[in-house]
UniProtKB/Swiss-Prot annotation:
PANTHER family: HEAT SHOCK PROTEIN 70KDA. Residues 602-637 are annotated as: Disordered. Induction: By stress conditions e.g. heat shock. PROSITE patterns: HSP70_1, HSP70_2, HSP70_3. HAMAP family: DnaK (MF_00332). Belongs to the heat shock protein 70 family. Transmembrane segments: none annotated. It comes from the Bacteria. This is Chaperone protein dnaK2. The modification Phosphothreonine is found at residue 197. Keywords: ATP-binding, Chaperone, Nucleotide-binding, Phosphoprotein, Stress response. The lineage of its organism: Bacteria, Bacillati, Cyanobacteriota, Cyanophyceae, Synechococcales. Acts as a chaperone.
């Protein structure tokens, strides 16, 4: 099998890594950076941009620039009411699912499709580094992602043309990277605060065994929320001074968001940050500017509620692991948002331990995913990973109650069977409502979907016996099987109605992505060809001017003719002619260059007998491979 890459598909930034020579290596993207912004944009020319280049143009193109899409993946519209208000692009309902609106293409995208473009770029950049096509990956997800979100992430990989060998929890991946060389047993708590999600996992690591004892988290808490409190502060301050709410203007909102992120980062190392946004808006009186100083103390005051929310999952994870903070050996900090001083202080206060900041918080998750990829590919030996399901799974029973079949923090993979019966006499079918969550009432938990089992022989209520089996694989993804013991009927049930895509939708998106990838490649090749042609036209003109009379008239005329024709092909965007004329002009320039060198060589040969000692010394003695010393000669007349 080929190389298996590990991908951290983040809310804000993503990262890709691979095992090389038994060690994980983070792969830089085509732009030379080790992390890639999880941003996809479409320009007015309908060109697709991914990564840094997409992020840079967001202010001028807020409607068609998609970021923080991970917060929508695998979710229903009614689950993302707050998140949808915080982005500059349109978030729409498609059935019960979420779609993002792209006005310039006049179409909607599923979050999986947008994430797939980020995954595709990471895989392509990794392929260029490795010198082979990347087709297999391990992709990370927040530990607290539910079944729908995990399945949606796997679908995104499929749309990107990747075989997703494993979905692995982000804190577990970080623990793999941290504990790979640990021989002695350690109990560690991984505190993972990323751009859009927050996870806490407690693990026992040592001698190649990584056992997750518990996990907790909040999928509605991350760096984006810290940015938002700054955005709101800036907007409210400006509104009180000028009477204008900048959040109603998409371009202004995008500028505020970028300024907030920059200020948040600065405040991790400085005690105050200057925020200057000239020409943020305009009124009949003229342009308006935003100029404000944000102190670290004010930021911590604004974010106090968010910081306090980080405490609850830590306490819950320790409680579920049946450990006290004094029994922990290390607190491993993961995710860019853990650089916030108030977050570090909270961890220290809650656990009475200094956080371990030896790992790179932006890269460690991808590194762990690469290690897991190495395990699956057989490159890494003697690693045993025991992960858990983050949320309880069950079914709705009589009275709207959730009956749990698999409780949270159960080691996966796992399988559990329960027997249920009918609620009324003569019932020939049952509808089973599959749920995920911790609340007592079905309506308060996440609905993963419903299915019907038909063909039950009529009988008094309570007599039929229906076996329902929940099976969670190593990815944490659920499948359900039902069997009527009376009739012997057994069938695997595909859960429908969940906030994920159907197989046919995924297949269609795979084909669309492949077609678009081909079209994008062709478009890039044309742009590269045009750039080469324009460069050569400029070089030809410059070269002819510099050489002047040294070029024979016939040769110069041929170069000028080819250069003019190539310029005409560029203007007409005739790419076939461009390719041919590019090669022809290059050939003419090679001929001119060779002719000029021959002339100079002949002139030099004729001058040698004249007794120029310096020239004789430089060109005379010895091997052609001898060092050549640069020198200036003055011609004596």
């Amino acid at each position: 099998m080929g190389k298996v890459v590990g991908i951290d598909l983040g809310t804000t930034n993503s990262c890709v890594s691979v095992m090389e020579g038994g060690k994980p290596t983070v792969i830089a993207n085509a732009e030379g950076f080790r992390t890639t912004p999880s941003v996809v944009a479409y320009t007015k020319n309908q060109d697709q941009l991914v990564g840094q280049i997409a992020k840079r143009q967001a202010v001028m193109n807020p409607d068609n620039t998609f970021y923080s899409v991970k917060r929508f993946i695998g979710r229903r519209v009614d689950e993302v009411n707050e998140e949808s208000k915080e982005v500059s692009y349109g978030v729409e309902k498609a059935g019960s699912n979420v779609k993002v609106k792209c006005p310039v293409l006049d179409k909607q995208f599923a979050p999986e499709e947008v994430s797939a473009q980020v995954l595709r770029k990471l895989a392509e950049d990794a392929g260029k580094y490795l010198g082979e096509t990347v087709t297999q990956a391990v992709i990370t997800v927040p530990a607290y992602f539910n079944d729908s979100q995990r399945q949606a992430t796997k679908d995104a990989g499929k749309i990107a043309g990747l075989e997703v060998l494993r979905i692995i929890n982000e804190p577990t991946a970080a623990a793999l990277a941290y504990g790979l060389d640990k021989k002695s047993n350690e109990r560690i708590l991984v505190f993972d605060l990323g751009g859009g999600t927050f996870d806490v996992s407690v693990l026992e690591v040592g001698d190649g065994v990584f056992e997750v004892l518990s996990t907790s988290g909040d999928t509605h808490l991350g760096g984006d929320d810290f940015d938002k409190v700054i955005v709101d502060h800036l907007a409210e301050t400006f509104k009180s001074n000028e009477g204008i709410d900048l959040r109603q203007d998409k371009q202004a909102l995008q500028r505020l968001t970028e300024a907030a992120e920059k200020a948040k980062i600065e405040l991790s190392s400085a005690t105050q940050s200057e925020i200057n946004l000239p020409f943020i808006t305009a009124t009949p009186e003229g342009p308006k500017h935003l100029d404000l100083t944000l102190t670290r103390a004010k930021f911590e005051e604004l974010a106090a509620n968010l910081i306090d929310r980080c405490r609850i999952p830590v306490e819950q994870a320790l409680k579920d692991a049946k450990l006290s903070s004094s029994e922990l050996d290390e607190i491993v900090m993961v995710g860019g948002s853990t650089r916030i001083p108030a977050v570090l202080e909270l961890v220290k206060r809650t656990t009475s331990k200094d956080p371990n900041q030896t790992v790179n918080p932006d890269e460690v998750v991808a590194v762990g995913a690469a290690i897991q990829g190495g395990v699956l590919a057989g490159e890494v030996k003697d690693i045993l990973l025991l992960d858990v399901t983050p949320l309880s799974l069950g079914v709705e029973t009589l009275g709207g109650v959730m009956t749990k079949m698999i409780t949270r923090n159960t080691t996966v993979p796992t399988k559990k069977t329960e027997t249920y019966s009918t609620a009324v006499d003569g019932q020939t079918n049952v509808e089973i409502h599959v749920l995920q969550g911790e609340r007592e009432m079905a309506s308060d938990n996440k609905s993963l979907g419903t299915f019907r089992l038909d063909g039950i022989p009529p009988a008094p209520r309570g007599v039929p016996q229906i076996e329902v089996t929940f099976d969670i694989d190593a990815n944490g993804i659920l499948s359900v099987t039902a069997k009527d013991k009376g009739s012997g009927k057994e069938q695997s049930i595909s859960i429908t109605g969940a906030s994920t895509l159907s197989d046919s939708e995924v297949d269609k998106m795979v084909k669309d992505a492949e077609a678009n990838a081909s079209a994008d490649k062709e478009k890039r090749e044309k742009i590269d060809l045009k750039n080469q042609a324009e460069t050569l036209v400029y070089q030809a003109e410059k070269q002819m001017g510099e050489l002047g009379d040294k070029v024979e008239a016939d040769a110069k005329a041929k170069v000028d003719e080819k250069r003019t024709k190539l310029q005409e092909a560029i203007n007409a965007e005739d790419y076939d002619a461009m390719k041919t004329l590019l090669e022809e002009l290059q050939q003419e320039l090679y001929t001119v260059g060779a002719s000029v060198y021959q002339q100079e060589g002949a002139a030099a040969g004729g001058a040698a007998p004249g007794g120029d000692a310096g020239a004789s010394a430089a060109s005379g003695g010895g091997d052609a491979s001898d060092d050549v010393i640069d020198a200036e000669f003055t011609e004596t007349k």
